[in-house]
Amino acid sequence: CYRKPAVGDDDKDLLDLIDTLNQYVGVTITYDFGDDKEVLDGTTISTWLSEGTDEKVSIDEEEVLAFVKTLAKKYNTAYSPKELKTSYGTTVTVTGGFYGWRIDNSGEVEQILADLKAGKDVEREPVYLTTANSHGEHDYGDSYVEINLTNQHLFLYKDGKLVVESDFVSGNLSKGHDTPTGAFGLTYKTMNAVLRGPDYETPVTYWMPFNGDVGMHDATWRNKFGGSIYKTGGSHGCINLPASAAKKIYETIDKGYAVLVYRMPGDNPTVVQQPQADVPSVINAISIIGPVTLESETAIVNARNMYNSLSDADKAQVTNYDTLTAAEAALAALKAQQPADGGQQ
């Protein structure tokens, strides 16, 4: 005779167990990483599953975490060096900072478990702690703030186009307040803030922090920017900007916008590489000059050089050329009455 099995093939708990196992291994999760895809399916999921002591399906969360860590190792870019072709034509490696893609390991484990229990195929991004602008070769894409500490000069690019260009004053070297280099994401932005430290309390109109208490802001107490001011008359670490430049930057960028801060080899300013000139780029270069101040000189000179490089036929198509000549005249008038440097902290 045969012993009757303790559990028959019509046992409800057994059938529920089988249904749950089939549900879990039947799920496919497709991860989007820009042009790349990663697929999690039953082949991997099945290795995580076992029967628990309560006749329920048990998922080995340590194995799920190990899978998530393989994704993170392959696709995380936060804290990694960034290659940047600068506005000066050279390529630098920006080290330090936290900008980039970073998967939330525990958050992604929880999301995978939820997807399995929902029993439906999904296509999605992983759960991130921090995100970036692009999954391409450069995670900051074509929209970023470029801050050159060596030349004390800033460039703001939006969708590959130069929107703002300005001199600035960074952290005071002689007092140990050097502005840190690295790739960062804008933390937030706000107007009419008061910046406080152990020995100062400074109201500013445009406040854009990107690395703790270090950020970009207007510095209306200064009448000169750029050059070597920062070496002995610099800030407490922030990027001090002319009010007009700070306003344009504030109006263009939002939380998470890439800010790349670097130094170039040597200590002498390098000539900015002129963009490839065509009619639309010249019109754009003229349009971003805005209200003319002493800090507009670089933008005006760049626009003039770009215009001069055009053919006569193309020059005739620059519809805002009168704006350029008016800006040049206004700058000349300002320089003629330029006051002596009273550079304040």
Kindly give the residue locations of the regions a language model identified:
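Exported/periplasmic cell-wall-interacting domains
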Residues: 66, 178-181, 193-274
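Stable alpha-helical elements in mature extracytoplasmic
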Residues: 60-67, 108, 245-249, 299, ...
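Short, polar loop/linker segments at the starts of domains and inter-domain junctions
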Residues: 39-40, 201-202, 226-230, 295-300
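Surface-exposed flexible segments
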Residues: 43-50, 159, 225, 274, ...
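Surface-exposed, secretory/extracytoplasmic low-complexity segments enriched in Ser/Thr/Asn/Gly/Pro
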Residues: 1-201, 206, 253-255, 260-266, ...
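Alpha-helix boundary recognition
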Residues: 113, 117, 200, 209, ...
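Beta-rich interaction/scaffold domains
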Residues: 274-345
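Short, flexible active-site loop motifs that bind/organize anionic cofactors or intermediates
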Residues: 54, 98, 236, 305, ...
